[in-house]
């Protein structure tokens, strides 16, 4: 089963490029809103790092989500797309002074703080602007996630967050400061997580920490559990919308949320992953000693995930219905790691065929680079190509 694409329109465009199916995106956003409506205390922020294409951001903002940003540039992108500043949260282990000042100037909802030195800088910069900054502390819960090692973020060995044993001390420091207001706790254990048991483990850890704080009569208004929900890379046509029902229900059943608390989520991949495809043209079919190579005009500069994470993306020859043959699908970049997949079954490939690399809406266009002096790929939505 292949995806449905406007192939005639594609033939008029310079490849490679990203294509975003806005129906899939809107269906995904609708599914999220349908589930979140069951839980009045839930609030969802879109993780801008997954995809900051302005046309994509605008559709997401129209759904009512907030924005989760990890740089000053992302804050600007979110504001340009119309996200209200009071629905923007700012995370990241290394926030520069100008980025903190930018967040203060816009009046964003919250800074997710990852160290005492960062807290001290935020307090100092807020004082200079005569403002009080809302802060939540990102706690490293030492919870592992069943995902690639490079995208785990909740283990003690990771660079992210404040260790659990330091939580009390950091909160005490914040409570003595005049220009920061401690409002919450933040967690994020990793990305592309499909095992709900990982989220249950996080809930158990959050419950423990909440009990500990309440014993000290410290009440926390906001709990932010990050995101991490994965997508089905193997079956983008069969499961284009992730299982948000199970995801949100897991937290409803396992997290002991207090009546006065708001629970925040930061979803990225699960929002945009399945709506995007990288469209590439076959330059050559090369017969090697033991295998055939399909050489594309897209490479690791356009979609780095296979080279960086050994990630799998389903590939489809969308211009051929001939019998399947096995190919190593590679790009033109001068790196041996510029390989999208080995022994991939595709309908017989010829020069000029269009290959769609599916489930590329997240961490695709946004991570593209100009290595080898290549131009960045453009992004088009289905709304544009009607």
Where in this protein do the model-derived segments appear?
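Short acidic, glycine/serine/threonine-rich loops at helix termini
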Residues: 57, 80, 100-105, 122-125, ...
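A charged N-terminal "starter" segment
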Residues: 1-133, 172-181, 211-218, 345, ...
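Conserved, mostly hydrophobic/aromatic
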Residues: 25, 49, 71, 103, ...
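Hydrophobic "anchor" residues on beta-strands that sit immediately upstream
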Residues: 45, 134, 222, 262, ...
